[in-house]
Amino acid sequence: MLRRWNIVIESLRRVHSSDLENLISASLYNRTLCTASESLNHGVVDESYVLAELSSLLPISSNKTSVSKEDSSSKNQVAIDSFLSAEDKLRGVFLQKLKGKSAIQKSLSSLGIGLSIDIVADVLNRGNLSGEAMVTFFDWAVREPGVTKDVGSYSVILRALGRRKLFSFMMDVLKGMVCEGVNPDLECLTIAMDSFVRVHYVRRAIELFEESESFGVKCSTESFNALLRCLCERSHVSAAKSVFNAKKGNIPFDSCSYNIMISGWSKLGEVEEMEKVLKEMVESGFGPDCLSYSHLIEGLGRTGRINDSVEIFDNIKHKGNVPDANVYNAMICNFISARDFDESMRYYRRMLDEECEPNLETYSKLVSGLIKGRKVSDALEIFEEMLSRGVLPTTGLVTSFLKPLCSYGPPHAAMVIYQKSRKAGCRISESAYKLLLKRLSRFGKCGMLLNVWDEMQESGYPSDVEVYEYIVDGLCIIGHLENAVLVMEEAMRKGFCPNRFVYSRLSSKLMASNKTELAYKLFLKIKKARATENARSFWRSNGWHF
């Protein structure tokens, strides 16, 4: 023991104190310490031997280090989790590949997330969970507070499974509802049938209807109408006709059954088939109503028989019926399709004179038709009337108005619709904001561009690389090159790399303005950002998501 201490002390004495750290780390020295051994036993004592003696004589406790590592890792985990939404955290549990449902449910419960049916719907509808994972998550969710085990909750999982064509899991959930004490209703049956029809599994949808009583859903006129509606809305009208004829006499039909068949043939423009169904409807003791006439008028319009549709419209009053909004909408749609905008406006004014209140479909067809026909002033006038009557457009409808307006002409009309919709309380979609930014950028309207950008961020939409490119382009057009560089640097700080065309345009303008130093600094930053982007693309192509 004394000899080992002497070797270590003699070695440390002959090494300069500044070189001690390098000696212990063994990273800078490959030569051995021979001086100590010459005076003691004339042997060779290498560096590894000295380090081994030090480690045995001076042990260092690793408890403190491990604790600090655990603390830092927990802090990092908290920092990472702060960037994740509740839906991503819940989906992330299934990425861990835990074995057993109990382990998965325990991990889900440990997250401590307050569940709601909206969060459950987001987890199921987004991402790429397997069918088994979706069912496992739903079984856990309905046992948690905040999510009730009722028909509404089960309709969410049925719709999510049907949308992804996971039909075996969908049928298991539908059959298991009764065992869980929840009786399926017509909505659940409709979701399942529509899921089959959507992927052209018509026979399975019909078989599901015939087996509906085994699920607790009565085979009635309402369920039969739901089957017909699923088939006709997906253009399987011939199959609907076969089922309609097969069930005639077994299931009592009502006027809705006949109207669904008429609407199906109307979408295909089959006037003769519509007339046959209308004749059967009258023979069965059901008089055609305004909905029947509206489908008939639409079908005639699709075949170009506008004059016949006008004749039917004029005969409605003679038969004791008063045209409603559906009938007027069909006439307006026919004339818009024929690009006869004056006649469509005449029927709209006639509708108001007859004190028939226009609905959202009326204004949707009018405004969209006038915009596509480039009757922008008339479209803006109708849009203002729409808002003045308290009819608010949906988010998707506002986007459909803005899309054609942002494809031709200056952005004035698009900005009018955007500002009035926003003022009325309508929510603007992210795609609508991008359409506006792109159009304003092209025309160099940077004041409006920056205002819309601020309003987009106020609405909760994050700025992606596409948005930054529009801003940089707009600033380049009006010559605000320094501001364009600042925006591009902000984009790179957020991990985005603008495309080569945007950078090339900005760099060329900087060089033309004798701002060589600024252009060179931007080049270095773009070079680094592009390398990072290429690395990220390589990671993702190999399945490494960081």
From Swiss-Prot:
One Pfam match: PPR
UniProt PPR repeat ranges: 150-184, 185-219, 220-250, 254-288, 289-323, 324-358, 359-393, 394-428, 429-463, 464-498, 499-533
InterPro entries, per the entry: Mito_RNA_Proc_CCM1, Pentatricopeptide_rpt, TPR-like_helical_dom_sf
UniProt keyword list: Repeat
Cystine bridges: none
Record has Flavoprotein as a keyword: no
Presence of keyword Transmembrane: no
Similarity comment: family membership: Belongs to the PPR family. P subfamily.
Stated name of the protein: Putative pentatricopeptide repeat-containing protein At5g43820
